[in-house]
UniProtKB/Swiss-Prot annotation:
Gene Ontology annotations for the cellular component aspect, listed alphabetically: bicellular tight junction; cell-cell contact zone; cytosol; extracellular exosome; membrane raft; midbody; plasma membrane; recycling endosome membrane
Superkingdom in the source lineage: Eukaryota
UniProt keyword list: Cell membrane, Cell projection, Endosome, Golgi apparatus, GTP-binding, Hydrolase, Lipoprotein, Lysosome, Membrane, Methylation, Nucleotide-binding, Palmitate, Prenylation, Ubl conjugation
Inhibition and activation profile: Activated by the guanine nucleotide-exchange factors RAPGEF3 and RAPGEF4 in a cAMP-dependent manner. Nucleotide exchange is also specifically stimulated by RAPGEF5, RASGEF1A and RASGEF1B.
Top-rank EC class of the record's enzyme: hydrolase
Gene giving rise to this polypeptide: RAP2A
Lipid group attachment sites (S-palmitoyl cysteine): C176, C177
Biological role: Small GTP-binding protein which cycles between a GDP-bound inactive and a GTP-bound active form. In its active form interacts with and regulates several effectors including MAP4K4, MINK1 and TNIK. Part of a signaling complex composed of NEDD4, RAP2A and TNIK which regulates neuronal dendrite extension and arborization during development. More generally, it is part of several signaling cascades and may regulate cytoskeletal rearrangements, cell migration, cell adhesion and cell spreading.
First-listed, main subcellular location of the protein, grouped into a coarse class: other
Sites of S-farnesyl cysteine lipidation: C180
UniProt modified residues of type Cysteine methyl ester: C180
Subunit field text: Interacts (GTP-bound form) with RUNDC3A. Interacts with PLCE1. Interacts with ARHGAP29, SGSM1, SGSM2 and SGSM3. Interacts (GTP-bound form preferentially) with TNIK (via the CNH domain); the interaction is direct and recruits RAP2A to the E3 ubiquitin ligase NEDD4. Interacts with MINK1. Interacts (GTP-bound form preferentially) with MAP4K4. Interacts with cytoskeletal actin. Interacts with RGS14; the interaction is GTP-dependent.
Name of the protein this chain belongs to: Ras-related protein Rap-2a
UniProt membrane topology term: Lipid-anchor
């Protein structure tokens, strides 16, 4: 059984913990309690292949931003979360993606851009088109989710497993360390 390390990144209050807890336990956290760092494990079967996800739910506050390099270094897949009802959280996600690329020294890191809180459609500040365009620019999948309603939560974690499986394939895009030798 494959084991993968998934890191969930985003600003404070975007729903990183709510998404993770909804996926792992099937329950929604109503009260906002800022996270420093939480670690979860869950077995998941994607495309008939069992895997174990080690999910690191990170702090969204700048006070703990210095710890991000270590999270990124150890992570294999990244879920970048912003809140659909907070334009600033959408802007804040861009330097986080840049940090992943800087630490990994590779542009094709398995990641998914996620607009959370789709249940608050009437308060939306970030359009679907804006999220989709940014994901296309980054060449990564894009999803809108709701931890509260469990909308696309399981699909999100299944998709990051697919991204990591693809990256791990010998004929997949292996990045900086792949080489072709002709003798």
């Amino acid at each position: 059984m494959r084991e993968y390390k998934v890191v969930v990144l985003g600003s404070g209050g975007v729903g990183k913990s709510a998404l993770t807890v909804q996926f792992v336990t099937g329950s929604f956290i109503e009260k906002y309690d800022p996270t420093i760092e939480d670690f979860y494990r869950k077995e998941i079967e994607v495309d008939s292949s069992p895997s174990v996800l080690e999910i690191l739910d990170t702090a969204g506050t700048e006070q703990f931003a210095s710890m991000r390099d270590l999270y990124i270094k150890n992570g294999q897949g990244f879920i970048l979360v912003y809140s659909l009802v907070n334009q600033q959280s959408f802007q804040d996600i861009k330097p986080m993606r840049d940090q992943i690329i800087r630490v990994k020294r590779y542009e094709r890191v398995p990641m998914i851009l996620v607009g959370n809180k789709v249940d608050l459609e009437g308060e939306r500040e970030v359009s679907y088109g804006e999220g989709k365009a940014l994901a296309e620019e980054w060449s990564c999948p894009f999803m809108e989710t709701s931890a509260k309603n469990k909308a696309s939560v399981d699909e999100l974690f299944a998709e990051i497993v697919r991204q990591m499986n693809y990256a791990a394939q010998p004929n997949g895009d292996e990045g900086c360390c792949s080489a072709c030798v002709i003798l």
